[in-house]
Amino acid sequence: MAVVYAHVSDDILAVSLERVCLQNHVSIPEDLSIISFNNSLFARSTSPQLTSIDINSKQLGIEAASQMINHIENPNLVATKIIVPHQLIERDSCCKING
């Protein structure tokens, strides 16, 4: 069987997907590789553990608060683009595609 990939927008949804797959005898990661988003506690508490993208939520919050404070203090200030580093946390819900 070909390996299928699912990128799920949130760890909680990925946990639900993982549960449904296992109930229907879909093997993770052999039949379906799952990558989730947020790298929350949920990603680490499943079996197999979910591969997840860590969006660096603490830094994201700091930058958002800073932007809001700057805008309140200087209403004419133009918003600036800020890129917060993210990281792929590889766990057990993905496998390499051979071929």
Question: What annotation goes with each model-predicted range?
Answer:
Residues M1-G99:
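Flexible loop/turn connectors
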